[in-house]
Structure formats: C-alpha cells, structure tokens
C-alpha cells in the first residue's frame, strides 16, 4: 500500500489489513492469527510525504485507518500488486461469467503467492513455501505464467536443504519442524517433470536429477517392504471433507496416498533418466516402479483391480496415477461416489486436483462438468457466489450467513485448489501437450450443454496456441491457432484432422 500524507512532525499514519469483513460488515482480522499486518509511519513534517513498505508485503482486500492526520482522500492511497517478474502466458474465457471469475481468482491467488517463493498464503503468520501446495498447482502455474525460472530457483533451494537421508522438507526454505511426507516431498520430482513438459527444457531435469534419486531412495528405505511407503508422518488427504470430526486429515488411507506418490516419483525419476540418457538408471527406476505398482495392487486393490477403500480421493489417485489395469470399473466406482454425494466432492488437498481429470479422462466428462459448475458448497463456484476474488483454503471459509469456518486455519488466499484451472485449458478447450514444450500437441475439446462458447490460449516456447469453439445450429464452430514449427492433432465428435502452423476455422456437425 502506497500513501501520501501531510502533517506536522510526529504525526502518525497507522493502518492494518484484512481479507474479509464479518457478517456485520466489521473489519475482520482473527484469521490472521498472530500476524498484525500493521503499518506505522511517523511524519517528519513539512512537505507532503509519500511512503510504501519496502521489506514486507500484505495479502488484503481492505485496510483500516487507525491514525491519520488531517482529511482523508482516497486519491492518497494506492494498492500495488506484487509478484515475481514473470510473463503472463495464458488466456481463458467462456460463456459462464462465474467460471470466468473463478479463473481470475486463480490468477490473483497465483500472483499474490508467487513472490520469489511459492507460498501457501500471503497474509497470516505463515507465508511459507509449502511443497505440497506447489506440486498440486504446478501444472496450472506453468500454463498461467512462465514459472520456469522461479521454480528452478526454488527447487535448487529444496536440493540445498536436502539432508543426507534424502528427504525433502515440507517447507522450502526450511522454516520449522522436521516433518516431510508424501505429496509434499514429492514436489522434488513432480515440479521438474511438469516444468519440462510445459517448456521443453531438460536442464531442470539434469539439475534436479540427483535430488529426485535421493528422494526415491529415501522412501525406499523407510519400511520393511521397499515397495510400499507405510511408515512415518503423513499429512494424508489434508482438509478432506470426509475427515472425522475434529481432524484435518481426510478419510483416505494415508499410506495408500504415500505409496501412490512413491510410484509417481519413481516413474518421474525413470522418465528423467531416459531423457538424460542415463540408461542403467532408467532401467533401475523403471523396474522399481513396476515393483511398487505391483505392491500397491496387492495392498490396496481387489483382485479385479478396483480399490479396496472406497473414497473419492483413493479412486481418483488410482485413476490419475495409472495404478490399475481396470480403469473402467474404478471410474464407475468414483462416479458412483460422486453421484451418491449429491454430485459433490469430499476430496482434500491431495484428491481435489485430480478428481476432475480422473472423471473426464475415463468417460465421465459430464460429471466432471457437474463438479466444476456446481454453485453450492462444496464447490469452486461457491466462493465466487460469496464474492471471492482469490481461492480459499476451505470450501466454506465464509458461510452463507456471514460467519466464518474457523479462526485458526481460514485463509482466503490459498492457491492450491486453483489447480482446477488447468482443466479449463486441457479439457474445456482441449489443449494437451503431446511432446515437451508443445512441440506437438492435441486439441480435443470437451463440450457441454451448459456452455455456449469457450476460448483458451497458451503462449508456448514456439508461439501462441489457441483453441476456440462456439456452438452453432447443427454443430460447433472451431478456430484453432498452431504456432510455427509445431504440429497439432484435432479431434472432436469423431472428426479428426492433422494441422501444421497456421490459423484454421471450420465447423463440425453434431
């Protein structure tokens, strides 16, 4: 916040910051916990003075003037957004204004939290580089902005803090505590992999490969069975809505989650080894991955490949992480769980980023749309209906009557659940990379009767990719843009085309 003020020497300007107002319209700071978010400035006197904080930042929508000399003019106060200096690389718009607002909220949440470090929140007494938040959001982050340099630096910090055991801290830079855990520490393999896929630069894989290896070997050494991760501290499906009363941990078996992520990290490490030409290491990690996958099946799947524990998160992870040979049955189980819950999610930090993909990739795109377009709690659009401008930590952080979910853990600027926005590009508009950096890509849009048009663009290393569709009588009209030196495969409703660079307009019959 920048302000101008006139007064005599010794006069003071004092104000604090808040994200929301309470149900009576009062300034609300309880969710800041011990953070004061207070600015105090003492005037030297004489000419008009201007000031803005240099060594701190705040996450806020409102300020409250506690002391101020003279008359107050809004013209003397200006709020400036602060974030890492990176390039905007995406656009999205559709016929649903609430969905458009949700995407804007995702962007604000990302920018507000990407200030040199990807923090969980920018306002309360935390503001820390939680690895779990970063990894669930990385796919969306890399679409919205060019985050290659930011994550290269942050992952280097993670590697520097990696102890001899190979574990990855839950917070980078390390702030407190010794705990790590699945889905959090796995940022060291997931983030480099997604950065490589988005930008096509294998340098980040080369730079982080040793850390990826050490993390996988750390997990392997944790229990008696080297192919299961079933020991130690785990966050589980954090903030899952199926948690027991008084708990933040969702119902899904935390060791199912841990072993699923163990498989993913091993698979990512094997892939990195192949890309980097490390033939023997690639074979070692591919073999290890197969053994982990087999052990996972023995421990957590039924003989027919369905999941023993029937939760939304368990089924979503098994589908998205390709841990079953019977995706048809697992997808049907997931769909039934969602349907039986009133077409609403019970997932937390771990399950939420994947449930939409788990449905739409396996024949339930309409149900995925049901979740994305749902307005009632729990849903992404509930917060939009409550006037949100960023992504909330809790689905019902602010309740319909204006009361708060909690004072202890109730951030209104927590970007992790904004991971859903990648689906706007990959499925609503259908842009999916088929080769690193989008050297080759697909456009396979998934239309729904509740949207009449959608338009998305991604600025890749080769130029702009655009996918735009609009419903017309008898079918849908498409406009796609293919950048130079790339190839595109288009598919919709049985129609298939292959395109080189250029701009194309055509109609596909229903």
Predicted regions, residues:
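Alpha-helical support elements that line or immediately flank enzyme active sites
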Residues: 1-19, 66, 131-161, 192-202, ...
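Extracellular/oxidizing-compartment recognition motifs
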Residues: 1-124, 132-133, 149-152, 158, ...
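Acidic, mature catalytic/reactive cores of soluble proteins
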Residues: 9-23, 81, 93, 209-221, ...
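Non-catalytic C-terminal accessory modules of carbohydrate-active enzymes
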Residues: 23-24, 366-510
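Helix-terminus loop motifs that line ligand-binding clefts
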Residues: 23-36, 145-247, 376-402
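The feature captures the catalytic groove of carbohydrate-active enzymes
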Residues: 28-30, 36-39, 45, 119-121, ...
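Structural helix-adjacent loops and short alpha-helical linkers that scaffold large soluble proteins
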Residues: 68-76, 99, 142-155, 162, ...
């Amino acid at each position: 916040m920048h302000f101008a003020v006139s007064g005599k020497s010794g006069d003071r300007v004092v104000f604090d910051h808040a994200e929301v107002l309470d149900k009576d319209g009062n300034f609300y700071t309880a969710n800041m916990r011990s953070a004061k978010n207070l600015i105090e400035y003492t005037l030297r006197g004489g000419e008009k003075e201007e000031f803005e904080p240099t060594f701190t930042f705040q996450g806020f929508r409102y300020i409250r003037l506690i002391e101020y000399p003279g008359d107050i003019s809004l013209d003397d106060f200006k709020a400036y957004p602060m974030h890492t200096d990176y390039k905007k690389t995406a656009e999205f718009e559709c016929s649903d204004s609430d969905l458009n607002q949700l995407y804007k909220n995702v962007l604000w949440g990302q920018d507000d939290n990407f200030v040199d470090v990807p923090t969980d929140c920018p306002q309360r007494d935390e503001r820390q580089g939680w690895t779990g938040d970063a990894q669930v959001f990385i796919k969306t982050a890399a679409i919205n902005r060019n985050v290659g340099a930011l994550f290269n630096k942050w992952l280097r910090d993670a590697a520097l803090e990696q102890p001899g055991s190979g574990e990855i801290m839950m917070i980078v830079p390390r702030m407190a505590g010794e705990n790590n855990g699945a889905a959090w520490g796995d940022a060291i393999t997931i983030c480099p992999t997604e950065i490589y896929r988005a930008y096509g630069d294998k340098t980040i894989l080369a730079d982080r490969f040793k850390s990826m290896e050490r993390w996988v070997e750390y997990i392997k050494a944790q229990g008696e069975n080297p192919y299961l991760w079933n020991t130690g501290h785990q966050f589980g499906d954090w903030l899952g809505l199926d948690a027991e009363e008084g708990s933040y941990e969702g119902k899904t078996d935390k060791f199912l989650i841990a072993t699923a992520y163990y498989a993913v990290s091993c698979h990512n490490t094997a892939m990195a080894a192949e890309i980097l030409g490390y033939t023997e290491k690639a074979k070692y990690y591919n073999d290890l991955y197969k053994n982990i996958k087999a052990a996972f099946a023995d421990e957590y799947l039924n003989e027919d490949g369905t999941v023993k524990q029937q939760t939304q998160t368990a089924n979503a992870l098994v589908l998205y992480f390709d841990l079953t040979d019977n995706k048809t049955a697992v997808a049907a189980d997931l769909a039934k769980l969602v349907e039986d819950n009133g077409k609403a999610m019970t997932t937390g930090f771990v399950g939420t980023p994947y449930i939409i993909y788990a449905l739409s990739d396996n024949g339930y795109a309409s149900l995925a749309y049901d979740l994305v377009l749902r307005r009632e709690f729990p849903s992404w659009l509930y917060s939009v209906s409550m006037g949100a401008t960023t992504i909330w930590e809790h689905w019902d952080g602010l309740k319909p009557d204006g009361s708060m979910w909690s004072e202890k853990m109730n951030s209104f600027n927590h970007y992790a659940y904004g991971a859903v926005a990648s689906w706007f590009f990959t499925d609503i508009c259908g842009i999916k990379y088929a080769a690193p950096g989008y050297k080759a890509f697909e456009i396979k849009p998934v239309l729904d009767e509740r949207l009449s048009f959608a338009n998305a663009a991604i600025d890749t290393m080769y130029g702009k990719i655009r996918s735009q569709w609009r419903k017309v009588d008898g079918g849908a009209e498409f406009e796609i843009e293919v950048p130079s030196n790339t190839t595109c495969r288009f598919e919709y409703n049985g129609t298939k085309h292959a395109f080189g660079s250029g701009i194309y307009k055509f109609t596909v019959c229903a």
